[in-house]
């Protein structure tokens, strides 16, 4: 029987510029697994860390940013990993930052700030597309989901 685990996070970083939402996408370095894959901030949850703490740490490590505001998206990505015969559930976060001055780590070789449609089309995996769509939907809804799921740090 397959195990179900939570060991990684996805976070979609955005900024507001000229009244428009712009998303950050990062291109994986050639020397890393999934080379040249465009993604949001992603990474493993370390021992003793919560998922949201891992998202903040990964944000700082991969981009140099600290979050201005952060919320839990109303979506959990998932995938099956044949190696280890396990199903991964991936918590998804929306993270707002206050500028576009990215400091890349060696994990990525390029970045871009783009509108939602471009970001969505740049991402490859369905889980990524669904995750960023959930964040974008929450940002453009007239309900209280962000208020209800905002993380205080």
Q: What is each of the regions a protein language model found here?
A:
Residues 13-15, 27, 92-96, 115:
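Short, well-ordered beta-strand micro-motif
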Residues 39, 87, 113:
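Short aromatic/basic micro-patch
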Residues 1-23:
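Conserved N-terminal beta-strand and adjoining loop/helix that marks the start
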Residues 60, 64-100:
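Active-site segment of metal-dependent pyrophosphate-handling enzymes
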Residues 92, 103-135:
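NUDIX/MutT-family hydrolases
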Residues 5, 34, 87-89:
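Residue-level preference for beta-strand/loop junctions
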Residues 127-153:
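Charged phosphate-binding loop/patch that engages nucleotide di/tri-phosphates or the phosphate backbone
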Residues 20-61:
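Conserved Nudix-box catalytic region and its N-terminal flanking loop in Nudix hydrolases
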């Amino acid at each position: 029987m397959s195990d179900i685990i939570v060991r990684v996070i996805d976070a979609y970083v955005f900024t507001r510029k000229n009244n428009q939402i712009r998303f950050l996408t990062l291109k994986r370095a050639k020397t890393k697994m999934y080379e040249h894959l465009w993604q949001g901030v992603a990474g493993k949850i370390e021992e003793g860390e919560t998922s949201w703490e891992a998202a903040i740490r990964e944000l700082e490590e991969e981009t140099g940013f600290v979050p201005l505001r952060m919320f839990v998206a109303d979506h959990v990505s998932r995938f099956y990993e044949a190696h280890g015969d396990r199903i991964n559930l991936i918590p998804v976060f929306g993270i707002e930052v206050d500028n576009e001055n990215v400091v890349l780590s060696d994990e990525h070789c390029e970045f871009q700030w783009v509108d939602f449609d471009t970001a969505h089309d740049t991402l490859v995996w369905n889980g990524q597309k669904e995750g960023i769509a959930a964040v974008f939907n929450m940002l453009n809804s007239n309900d209280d989901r962000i208020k209800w799921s905002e993380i205080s740090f």
